[in-house]
């Protein structure tokens, strides 16, 4: 919701010229300024929005993804990420099979497992989930720190609903477990795969080489995103829409 931008203490605009071509929404950025918030503009050219920002991060066209992956690596490598939020509101704790790179399903461990999503939960009553969709999605698995074992989760088990189950998902984990057929399955959390596999190619020097962005400002933005809360990232026109 664009309305939420006005409450941000940090507003990062990527690929969007709020001043010139988003005049219906640029007052939100002005309100951030009035409240003493910080503005950051990421764009190839220095334009009106850049002139209003606290700092402008220039970037080579079509390299925004590399920049954001590099920033993610800095945040994770410095343990600046919000572990509690990632556990409760993201898919990072969910387990993946290393052999197929697909999610580890409860049925992989117990062939008699039955899906546990309640028809009275938010998926059905609020989100409008259909049984046909749920049959395709199924349930998920995490490695629980408390019991030191794999536990099933439904798509409703987030936030307070996860805490009520008294499950503490391990975020950064890999291991070997026994499957329903008795064979060992090598698994890892999505966070583990993201941190040690996907992000390993996006060290700071490599990102600078790809994006032509300023090294110090990349580090500054990573620190700002990790420490200034609440923050908003406003992405415009799909980033690669024009290039």
Residues of each region from the PLM?
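Glycine-rich oxoanion-binding loops at beta->alpha junctions
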Residues: 1-11
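Glycine/threonine-rich flexible loop motifs
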Residues: 17-29
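A short helix->loop->beta-strand "cap" motif at the edges of active sites that frequently abuts
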Residues: 31-39
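Acidic catalytic cores of enzymes that act on phosphate-bearing nucleotides/polynucleotides
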Residues: 219-243
């Amino acid at each position: 919701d664009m309305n939420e931008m006005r409450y941000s203490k940090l507003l990062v605009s990527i690929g969007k010229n709020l001043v010139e071509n988003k005049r219906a929404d640029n007052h939100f950025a002005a309100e951030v300024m009035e409240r003493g918030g910080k503005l950051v503009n990421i764009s190839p050219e220095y334009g009106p929005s850049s002139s209003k920002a606290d700092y402008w991060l220039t970037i080579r066209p079509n390299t925004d993804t590399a920049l954001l992956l590099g920033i993610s690596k800095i945040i994770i490598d410095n343990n600046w990420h919000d572990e509690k939020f990632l556990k409760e509101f993201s898919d990072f704790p969910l387990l993946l099979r290393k052999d197929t790179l697909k999610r580890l399903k409860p049925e992989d461990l117990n062939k008699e497992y039955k899906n546990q999503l309640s028809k009275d939960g938010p998926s059905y009553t609020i989100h409008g989930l259909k049984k046909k969709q749920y049959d395709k999605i199924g349930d998920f698995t995490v490695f629980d720190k408390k019991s030191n074992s794999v536990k099933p989760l439904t798509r409703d088990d987030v936030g307070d609903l996860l805490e009520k189950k008294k499950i503490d998902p391990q975020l950064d984990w890999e291991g070997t477990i026994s499957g329903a057929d008795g064979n060992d399955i090598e698994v890892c959390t999505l966070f583990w795969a993201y941190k040690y596999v996907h992000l390993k190619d996006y060290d700071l020097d490599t990102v600078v080489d790809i994006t032509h962005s300023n090294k110090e400002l990349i580090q500054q933005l990573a620190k700002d995103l990790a420490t200034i809360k609440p923050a908003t990232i406003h992405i415009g026109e799909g980033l690669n829409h024009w290039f």
